[in-house]
């Protein structure tokens, strides 16, 4: 069985080796953020969508929840920049889990006492805020069922897909 050491990015997330009984198919992973799509799964089992926008409860409460869609941003950097844009401390933002920087990802975020109208005005390169709703609860780390991954392998050897 052949063993190949993966690049640092894969080692960082726990992928320590590739194994194959055959010669392998070749190819490259994560050449573009769209090659690695990460969609958070809510505790209710809903897989977040990258594109559609679903409005929620519009009755103002303490927390605004929204879906953060980002391309090529890590979670902490995105929230730091977002906090500057809306003029509040980064500590007012909460999320269920961080997502890979070199990916196109969708994750739920909450922010305390920032109206959705202010968030809807934010324009950032490679970041979209959507699916706004109000809640009386903050998000907590780990408040998700998991993540759904879509991975594209580019440059696969001819005939390997068979």
Regions found by a protein language model. Name each.
Residues 1-162:
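Terminal domain-initiation and capping elements
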